[in-house]
Amino acid sequence: MNTLSKSSLSYCGAELRRHDHDRFLTCLFAPATRREALYALYTFNLEVARTAEVVSEPMIGQIRLQWWRDAVAEIYEGRPRQHQVVQPLAEAVQAHSLTRSHFARLIDGREQDLDSDPPEDLAALEGYAEATGASLVRLALEILGVTRSAGEAAFAAGRHVGIAWALTGLLRAVPFHAQQKRLYLPVDVCARRDVSPGDLFELRSSPELARATEEIAVSAEAHLVEAYKLRHQVPAVARPALLLATLAGGYLKTLRRAAFDPFAPAVQADAPGRAWRLTWAALRRRF
């Protein structure tokens, strides 16, 4: 793994290091020739993912997402905008022939962040996780040189890793979303576990919330298990995009040790020894 000083990082690299350190660390295990493209892709994701946080009303959020749809369209038309993320993203798209539909699916998935209604059920939540998480992993795999003919196992594993990572992130973000009066816990899960959104929005943990959290965590763990089953079929070049599985597994174990209380300080903290954990997984040729 390469350690990089802040001064040596590009704009996208610096943004990723500051705002999505987990993904930044996984990039350091990618070949140097692919790293800037990963930085650009993941920083694009940052820009799209923070939409609901930086706008005051859904209509403005829709305008922001449309800006990114148009920016991606212009990249594929060969006339990228002058923008500090769009330009390097355009270089990544051109250099690695990235599939346009995955960008569209990711942006469309983020529209759900602007909807005040929670997902109806776990299937709907997993659909959101697949659109926003798995699509991003798929693009990262393309940057790393995974091809359709040789990479079916990698793409299948990537789908499971992307969903697991997104679900894990949503569970860890329950307090943050509650402060914004946003709820991602499915309606049917909340009803089944007697979770009161009112209590949640007052930032109160409860046994009922823990049971709902556990149900979603078990789903995330199941996706990791499915990804792990494919380990020996995944080409080595794909592993940097799948290393998030190592971190997701660690976060889920912490959540389990905290009795599935998303408000527990340990759950909110960054995983200790993240870099070493990733290094150990990479040395063992795992993810």
Which residues are covered by each model-predicted region?
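Catalytic cores of Mg2+-dependent Asp-rich isoprenoid enzymes
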Residues: 1-90, 99-110, 129-138, 153-166, ...
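Cofactor-binding active-site loop characterized by glycine-rich and histidine/acidic residues
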Residues: 96
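Helix-coil boundary and interhelical linker segments in multi-pass alpha-helical membrane proteins
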Residues: 147-151
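Acidic/His metal-coordination segments adjacent to aromatic residues that form catalytic metal sites
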Residues: 111-124, 205
